[in-house]
C-alpha cells in the first residue's frame, strides 16, 4: 500500500513537471529573461471561483528564494473579466501588507498602476518583468505597457505573491517551490 501511494505521488509530480516543461515561454519573457523556465504556477481563487493563474518564470540558474533581487517574470493569465483600476487598487492594498508605504509614494504607485493595468478578460495576460535594482516592466498580452523604475515598487509588487506576508501562502509556496497548486 505504501509503495503504491509513493508511486502515485511520484507519477503526479513527474506529470506536473512535464506539464510545466511543455509550457511555451511568452515572447516578452523570452526577450527579457533568456533561458526562462517556469519555477511554479498556481490558481488564485475567490469563493471557489478561478480568478487567474499565476506563473513565476526564472532564469536557468535562479534561486527562487532570492526573488527580490533576481531577474524573473511573473505572468498572470486571467480567467474572468476585471477592471484595470480594480486590479491597481487591490495591488496597493496587498503591497501594504508588507509594511507601511508613505502616502505620497502610495499615490504615485497607484496612479502608475492605474495607467499600466488595462481592463482584462478571460485569457488576457499581464506580465511583470523584474529588472533588479531598476524596477518592473509591464506587458499586457505581450505588448509593453510601460515601466515603474523604482526597485522598492518592484519588491513590493512582486511581494504580493512572493513575500512571506502574502495573503496567499499556498500560492506563494507553489510559485517559489516549483509546485503546482490547482
Language-model segments: what does each one mean?
Residues 1-13:
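N-terminal secretory signal peptides and thylakoid transit peptides that target proteins
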Residues 16-18:
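N-terminal signal peptide c-region/cleavage motif recognized by signal peptidases
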Residues 21-182:
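Terminal leader/tail segments of proteins
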Amino acid at each position: 500500500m505504501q509503495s503504491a501511494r509513493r508511486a502515485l505521488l511520484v507519477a503526479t509530480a513527474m506529470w506536473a513537471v512535464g506539464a510545466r516543461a511543455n509550457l511555451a515561454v511568452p515572447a516578452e519573457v523570452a526577450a527579457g529573461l533568456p533561458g526562462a523556465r517556469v519555477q511554479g504556477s498556481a490558481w488564485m481563487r475567490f469563493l471557489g471561483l478561478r480568478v487567474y493563474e499565476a506563473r513565476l518564470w526564472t532564469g536557468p540558474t535562479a534561486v527562487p528564494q532570492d526573488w527580490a533581487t533576481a531577474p524573473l517574470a511573473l505572468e498572470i493569465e486571467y480567467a474572468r473579466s476585471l477592471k484595470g483600476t480594480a486590479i491597481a487598487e487591490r495591488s496597493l492594498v496587498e503591497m501594504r501588507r508588507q509594511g507601511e508605504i508613505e502616502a505620497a509614494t502610495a499615490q504615485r504607485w497607484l496612479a502608475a498602476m492605474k495607467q499600466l493595468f488595462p481592463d482584462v478578460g478571460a485569457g488576457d495576460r499581464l506580465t511583470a518583468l523584474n529588472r533588479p535594482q531598476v524596477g518592473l516592466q509591464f506587458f499586457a498580452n505581450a505588448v509593453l505597457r510601460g515601466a515603474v523604475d523604482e526597485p522598492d515598487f518592484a519588491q513590493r509588487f512582486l511581494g504580493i505573491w512572493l513575500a512571506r506576508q502574502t495573503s496567499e501562502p499556498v500560492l506563494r509556496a507553489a510559485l517559489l517551490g516549483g509546485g503546482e497548486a490547482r
